[in-house]
Amino acid sequence: FKKKNKFLGKKFDLIIDLQKVVLRTLNLKKVPHKSFFSTCTNFIFSDYKNDKDFIFKGIYIERFYFNILSLIANNYFEKIPNIKIPKNKLSENIINTDKDTNIAIAPGAGNRIRQWDFQKYLEIAKDLREKGFNIYFFLGPQEQEYLNLCLENNFLCPEWKDGKMISNNITFTMKLAEKMKCLLCNDGGTAWMFEFAGVKTLKIFGVTDEKKFSRPGYCQTIQVNDYGIKEIKDFPVEEYKKNLDKFFETV
């Protein structure tokens, strides 16, 4: 921590440290503050102690943050509240098919090493369409490369029109999500939008932690490492279909 930096002359009411390396925690604690929260080395640097024995390792990430809030507020938040999604007019007339037959697929993720092969998702989509489902592909800006392929195979991409995204407002996607029966996805941002919109997901994991990034009650997971597979892209379609059949029993 150097005196000539952006924190000079500032003092924070509260700093919440999410570092896992002691040296970084020590540097962060040098920033002027009134109170400092840190789980590092069993709360040794923290002004707040874990006298309630809350769990902070190996848990769902949202529970992790609410446990932090519980200690700071000295009030345990047992139930994690749902989000009330405001109206979004742009989303109102895009999807008019029966929700019980609508299945969404989100083939993207922030990094390709977290993505199941797109062609495999396309194969799953074709199979589900033959069974009478309406398939909608949810593509973010980074998945624009799949847009034409989806359209050529007569699959709708409700977030897009004339080669451009209709809106980048998160409520737009979440309102569209509410019209879906479920979502098939990787561990990416779209999955979170669906889960917080109250839609169940079948989420495939490779390098990320399925326990940490799966919303309880809204997410069924596939961890490819459990099948002896190192890279998510190599997970076989037939094995995915078996998991999908089990997932459909829950939605």
What are these regions (language model features)?
Residues 1-251:
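Catalytic machinery of carbohydrate-active enzymes
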